[in-house]
């Protein structure tokens, strides 16, 4: 068993070197640069997608969220989500639920996979989750939220983190108080998505309360910001304006694993790298498919990667006929052939 953490007090710590440099550490794991994290995303952040994001510089990656009830019932789908490769480390496993005992049992189960972090999802706004008092739905019951967190922290040796939102609705923007209470029961870090449960993704993220948490003198754990980080300029703005200890990138990485390698130089030097050309999109989408086939088998891989095709080739003129063919075939060699056709067609177009 690999032990990646020495204590539960800190996830990201900035250590000054020579009064000029900053070193970012994950317990004894150290980053030479500002941390960029891939968000846990249902039906997206599986091992093949995490692999390609890791190739392009995601510092920490997370599993899709896993139902506590599913894990303790030995649901095949839930257990499969515990899979990860050593290449992915540091890696977090995220669980969700609405009661103490199932969450404790699920956390212990997740710990047997030896992740670097166990993350609790208190942020999902999807109705089927929130309506049952899980995800961001639990923000209606902050004492229960704190009780679950405390019990999970005490039940496992792996550092526990939380991902949540600003509050349930406009009348309950309570994240400053919530953050203190979660810190007090022992979480190692807190990721805050800058929207409410009720706004889902319909408005721009509000980072002012994320900044308020980060600048609260009572807070000493790392605060990771999430929401509307879409490119280098937005990443630099949120980092510099609100002082968060890391940035978590979610939907903007979908079909765009290059976002991590584009943000990094912008943060460090202000350099804006060009968007990937068609050859690079074909190359990386093929890697994604190959990893998916190896992990899931050809049939399931070809069904599940369909949602990624439009994202990988977003913005290309006249792509619809290729997309339709990619969506229809269940033969992996045929997909590879279509990808080669895409490469030839757009090379001829000068793209």
Predicted feature locations:
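Active-site beta-loop-alpha junctions enriched in small/polar residues
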Residues: 41-43, 66-68, 96-98, 123-125, ...
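Proteins enriched for Cys/Gly/acidic motifs involved in redox and nucleic-acid/cofactor modification
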Residues: 132, 138, 142, 268
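Short hydrophobic alpha-helical segments enriched in small aliphatic residues
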Residues: 3-6, 10-13
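Conserved, mostly hydrophobic/aromatic
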Residues: 38, 53, 64, 93, ...
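Alpha/beta catalytic cores of nucleotide-metabolism and tRNA/nucleoside-modifying enzymes
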Residues: 19-32, 42, 47-48, 155-157, ...
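Alpha/beta enzyme core
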Residues: 104-118, 122-132, 143-221
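Glycine-rich, positively charged N-terminal anion/phosphate-binding segment
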Residues: 21-26, 32, 41-116
